[in-house]
Swiss-Prot record:
It catalyses: 5-(methylsulfanyl)-alpha-D-ribose 1-phosphate = 5-(methylsulfanyl)-D-ribulose 1-phosphate. One of its GO terms (biological process) is L-methionine salvage from methylthioadenosine. Gene3D superfamilies: translation initiation factor eif-2b, domain 1, Translation initiation factor eif-2b, domain 2. The lineage of its organism: Bacteria, Bacillati, Bacillota, Bacilli, Bacillales. It comes from Bacillus anthracis. The record marks C160 as: Transition state stabilizer. InterPro entries: IF-2B-related, IF-M1Pi, IF_2B-like_C, Initiation_fac_2B_a/b/d, M1Pi_N, NagB/RpiA_transferase-like. Its EC number is 5.3.1.23. Transmembrane segments: none annotated. This is Methylthioribose-1-phosphate isomerase. It is an enzyme of class 5 (isomerase). The keyword Isomerase applies.
């Protein structure tokens, strides 16, 4: 039995509602929240109840399928207008995660030629389910490829949570840990706590422990010391957006780790599906970086820890330059070398 079966799914479709694993409640309680409107889906994404680029795309797809069932119009033209409004609305929830827009575009395209409302509603539900099913297979493939980069007994550092609960299943950066466990390859994770929302401390440690995988939690500012003293052999992270030249947006603090990897001469890998690539943007300078509420920094679990009125800069992501990345691990294999050329070649083959 796969080790990830022990980990609750991030998103489940109920036909007339969506059940999302409320990740703001972890690790203290495992609670599912029922979403029945497009507004609830939007809020759930913004409030990080569902998070992780692939999972955001999945819940957005289900949200659009759900919303379409509630349109009262009898005309396909009005149906399409309402649907496009909902697509645009969901797109405002988290601007950096490209899987969100990828899923929205895919849902839009699925009904472009449809002439009846009933058929459109049926196709939207089927497409959302297909997106979820495909993501599970894609993440397993990423894990298989990533595992070739490591050997039994390796200590591997990661940040944030790019695991099973951030995807349909398996995750991206955490996928090789699960595949490794299935195949008898023991990998030990060192998880950065990931301030300010503690996705590493709350989520990565929780899901790896669910699967019986060795994990050690460290504070973010311990990373250099851990690499130096704990025989860290590599760093692997997820991604929220990868552009045409390989520059990668991921959780704030990722670039710090890439710089440390360069200094300590250890590999720095990015693991992400092709749906996370945005080849319409040429460099990372074009990526819009989400900035979040100051209270994420000034308060910890609701308690004020900084003087009231303190100025806060709270970007959710940073951009790691391609020259700091050893390889980008996708479901199609590992991209190395001239990223601009190799990414263009890969997308030409898959188009």
């Amino acid at each position: 039995m796969s080790t990830v079966v022990r980990i609750p799914r991030s998103v489940s479709w109920k036909g007339d509602a969506i059940a999302v694993l409320n990740q703001t409640k972890l690790p203290h309680s495992t609670e599912y929240k029922t979403l029945t409107t497009i507004e609830e889906v939007w809020k759930s994404i913004v409030m990080l109840e569902v998070r992780g680029a692939p999972a955001i795309g999945i819940v957005a797809a289900f949200g659009l399928a759900l919303a379409s069932k509630k349109y009262t119009t009898l005309h396909i033209e009005e149906f399409q207008k309402k649907f496009n409004r909902d697509c645009n609305y969901l797109g405002t929830s988290r601007p950096t995660a490209v899987n969100l827009f990828w899923a929205i575009d895919r849902m839009r395209e699925s009904i472009q030629e449809i002439t009846t409302i009933k058929e459109a509603q049926k196709i939207l539900e089927e497409e959302a389910l297909r997106i979820q099913q495909e993501d599970e297979a894609v993440c397993r493939s990423i894990g298989e490829h990533a595992l070739t980069c490591f050997k039994d007994g390796d200590n591997i550092l990661t940040i944030c949570n790019a695991g099973s609960i951030a995807t349909a299943r398996y995750g991206t950066a955490l996928a090789p840990f699960y595949i490794g466990k299935e195949k008898g390859v023991r990998l030990h994770a060192y998880a950065c706590e990931t301030r300010p929302v503690l996705q590493g401390g709350r989520l990565t440690t929780w899901e790896l422990k669910q699967a019986g995988i060795d994990v050690t939690l460290i504070t973010d500012n311990t990373a250099a010391h851990a690499i130096q003293t704990k025989e860290i052999s590599a760093i692997i992270v997820g991604a929220d957006r990868i552009v045409a030249n390989g520059d990668t947006a991921n959780k704030i603090g990722t670039m710090n780790l890439a710089i440390l990897a360069k200094y300590f001469d250890i590999p720095f890998y990015v693991a992400a599906p092709l749906s996370t690539f945005d080849i319409t943007k040429q460099t990372g300078a074009e990526i819009v970086i989400e900035e979040r509420d100051e209270t994420e920094v000034t308060k910890i679990f609701g308690k004020q820890v900084a003087p009231v009125g303190t100025t806060v800069y709270n970007p959710a992501f940073d951009v790691t330059p391609n020259e700091l990345i050893t390889g980008i691990i996708t479901e199609k294999g590992i991209i190395r070398g001239d990223y601009k050329r190799e990414i263009a070649s890969l997308f030409k083959k898959t188009s």
